Each structure stands twice: as structure tokens, then as C-alpha cells.
């Protein structure tokens, strides 16, 4: 599987990292996608933990590419309800793509179903998700998934990179179960996790650190 790096291009008026990070605060324009033919799914991790990831698959009446399922992942502290996850869902659904809004392990409504939490190196969770999607049958899924493509924003992009690095040598499932994984897209994700930690602890980023801590504390209190 080849890798292509596409340079990030800023768009007015959101220039610089701070304005880009705060865009969803300034502009509450994320769409309501709850009525877009939703079908909830539950994905058992099958790793002895009993954990279950959850998601919502939105299937257009006329699929542009039958059998193809896009999957949208969220960042740290997010869920299937995150603004950018909903933007991506609405955009591709309107183009005729079936798309799944995913709750990573312990996120969103998967919290009471999980003992563990997602992190940047949990690529095995995506491999389990792919294997499940590509072998599941209705009514567990709304249609037979033959191909899947993952789009990961922020931390879920890191998880995607971790998964793709392992996919050729995994012992989680048979290689044939993963033939339908056609690729993935990581968007603005931390590749060097140590550098990302140092950056978020810098003086100018303390509001973000405070926000992230407020998101992570309930996970460990649960």
C-alpha cells in the first residue's frame, strides 16, 4: 500500500493553527445528520475484553458505489457526534456514498460497553473493525460491505497509520478478511506523538491542554 503526503493549504479567514483549531467554536454550522437513513452497528473487539465499538451507518437510497463503505473517525475527546465527523458524513452522503460515523473504543455511546479506551497505537482496533465490516451480514449491517475506506481526523489518523503498518502481518484475522480494505486518509494527525505532547504542553497551548484534560478525566473515572 503506497503512501502519499499532501501539503496542507490554509483557507481564509482561518489562518494559523489557533484559528483553525477554534473554527468549530466560532462557526456552529455542522449539519444534523440524524435523519440520513441511519443504522446503528455494534462491533465486538473479540480480544477477551468484552469491549464493543459502536457506529452509525448512513446509506443513501441510491449508492454511487454499491458495496463500498466509507468510515469517518474522530479525534481525541471526540465521538461520532463531532462536528467534522458530521460534515464529512453529510458531504459524502449527498454524493451517494454510504458512510459510517465511528465511535472508537470507549468514545460516545460505546463508553458503557468498554473497559478500555482508544489511543494512538490502537491500530488493532481498526483491523478488527475492518474484518468485522467485511464479513458481517444483514441485519448486523444494512448491506454487504465489499470494500471500505477509512478517513481519520487528528488522533484517528494516527490510529489509521498504526493499523496500516500492521495490516500485512496481523494475526487478528485471515488475510482474506482484509482484501476489501482499499486505503485510508489521515487528516492533520500527530505522526510523532512525543513531539505532539511537547507542543500541547507549551505555554501558548494551555487552553487546549485544559480542554483535553477535561475530556480524558471522565474516561478514567468511569
Residue ranges and their predicted role:
Residues 14-62:
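N-terminal cap/lid segment of alpha/beta-hydrolase-fold proteins
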Residues 41, 71, 100, 149-151, ...:
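Hydrophobic/aromatic beta-strand patches that form the interior of the parallel beta-sheet core
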Residues 66-75:
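Short beta-strand element of the alpha/beta-hydrolase
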Residues 76, 98, 103-107, 190:
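Short beta-to-alpha linker loops that shape the active-site pocket of alpha/beta-hydrolase fold enzymes
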Residues 83-101:
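Short amphipathic alpha-helix adjacent to the substrate-entry channel of hydrolases
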Residues 86, 90, 127, 161-165:
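Short, hydrophobic alpha-helix immediately C-terminal to the catalytic nucleophile
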Residues 89-91, 105-149:
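Catalytic nucleophile-loop/oxyanion-hole region of alpha/beta-hydrolase
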Residues 139-140, 144-222:
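Alpha/beta-hydrolase-fold enzymes
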